[in-house]
């Protein structure tokens, strides 16, 4: 019997659907000695609850990292590849090497560690739920910062997602530097379709 400690790393991304901003990924190794109550898929939590849990995760996890791929990278390699690259970057930055990586969804990044995709993993696996919370809060924070740079797009409100409000502002002001030019609504505004 092996004495090797099993270290599960949960990985998830945030921001595949928005028309603007980076896609974020987080990798989290939770400490079994410090369980964090209330972990759940970030999409089911209020912003306030996500922010509180993100602080707890950062304080109590054995290791955590957050990485991203820019809108420009998304346009160059497509959103799936950019999501996987952000995940790989997050895993590569870990200070502790996990024994297994569990990823939300079907696709796993190309890494040397055994990895498994779990559909709806953010609602089934605590480590993935923790990663989903860190990725979502980091991305939301970035979009609030982008709101300060580009107030005419109201990014703090819709976080770059293709809401009717965002689409109207996009049509009114055109695309800015952080809009994803490979996405159909942005292409339409730029006259590329």
Swiss-Prot record:
One of its GO terms (cellular component) is ribonuclease H2 complex. Its main location: cytoplasm. CDD domains: RNase_HII_bacteria_HII_like. PANTHER family: RIBONUCLEASE H2 SUBUNIT A (PTHR10954), RIBONUCLEASE HII (PTHR10954:SF18). A divalent metal cation binds at residues 12-13, 104. This is Ribonuclease HII. The gene is rnhB. It holds the Pfam family RNase_HII. The keyword Manganese applies. Belongs to the RNase HII family. It catalyses: Endonucleolytic cleavage to 5'-phosphomonoester. GO terms for biological process: DNA replication, removal of RNA primer; mismatch repair. It comes from the Bacteria.
